[in-house]
């Protein structure tokens, strides 16, 4: 699979580590944030994904512990149409404490996945399955 990558100012070159199918993304700028502040941190790259694929962006497991930031959209999804020269990838960060993220800090990671086939949605009156409870009910009696 070939992915075309354009690096912008401050970008750290991507590396693929052996035996990993997630690729780390680094902050392309140094950012100081205060508790409660939201900011999109530039990752400094634009990419052209292969047709029929999308990228999933999530925080690294240490991101919250090291910098106290959460990814505000839970998981970022970038489809192959977001492929222009200036379609720079970003990390939507919500700071839970005062923090500084330095240029080059590995704050998130991505992987490329094949998009699902277009589903056929069928409206029915009943699903004829047992109801299991509402959200948050798993594990309760």
What are these regions (language model features)?
Residues 1-141:
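DUTPase catalytic domain/fold
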């Amino acid at each position: 699979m070939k992915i075309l990558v354009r690096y912008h100012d401050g970008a750290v070159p991507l590396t693929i580590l052996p035996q990993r199918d997630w690729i780390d993304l680094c902050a392309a700028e140094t950012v100081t944030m205060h508790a409660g502040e939201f900011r999109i941190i530039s990752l400094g790259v634009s990419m052209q994904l292969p047709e029929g694929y999308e990228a999933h962006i999530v925080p690294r497991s240490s991101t919250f512990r090291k910098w106290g930031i959460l990814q505000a959209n839970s998981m970022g999804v970038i489809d192959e149409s977001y492929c222009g020269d200036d379609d720079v990838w970003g990390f939507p960060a919500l700071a839970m404490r005062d923090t500084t993220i330095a240029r080059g800090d590995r704050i998130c990671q991505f992987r490329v996945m094949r998009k699902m086939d277009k589903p056929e949605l069928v409206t029915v009156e009943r699903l004829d399955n047992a109801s299991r409870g509402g959200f948050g009910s798993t594990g309760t009696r």
